[in-house]
Amino acid sequence: MSPRPVTITSYNMHKGMSALNRKVQVNRMADALGALGSDVLFLQEVQGQHLNRSRRTDFPDAPHYDIIGDSLDYHRSYGKNAVYPKRHHGNAILSRLPLKTENNLNISVNKLEQRGLLHCEVVPEGWEDPLVCLCVHLNLREPDRLKQYRAISDYVGRYIRPESPLIIAGDFNDWRQKSARELGRALDLNEVFVDNTGK
């Protein structure tokens, strides 16, 4: 059997809210993500709990990864990054393929931005090895991101076999595409958009 291709989508959910936090958008997000038909979803700023907002009639009690996972009938894994007394959010990986959670690594470099790397594996049909999926959310400031590139590279070098197929996806907060160059050089990875479009 020849290996089946895998499609992925990465999306920052903004904690399930619209711009300026005016409207709850979780169900619309679930519909839009479902319409894409991707095998694996890499999601950032996923609300796990928000006790204050859940008092609103339009804000769901259930974690947003469960709402989307139930809507699409996907397996799911959630890693808390930012934890407060009455709320928490983080990264999530959802998959139509069987999903195994390996680790949730704190890659925060300051007190203002709590960031993480969620490590899961999926086994696509016909593949010999599991596909390693790393979902990340990186800082806004470039000097902070440089530290986080090193943390990601160190983690991959330590825990991921060199022959393993690997996808690193997420919100890199990187408008100048330095993450692709830095991580590509350090880990011998290709940037999918550059491969597909040449830019």
Predicted regions and their residues:
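Beta-strand-turn-beta hairpins that frame and shape the catalytic cleft
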Residues: 1-8, 89-91, 95-100, 113-135
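Short, solvent-exposed loop/turn elements at beta->coil junctions and helix N-caps
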Residues: 79-84, 107-109, 196
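Active-site metal-binding loops of divalent metal-dependent hydrolases
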Residues: 11-13, 46, 138, 165, ...
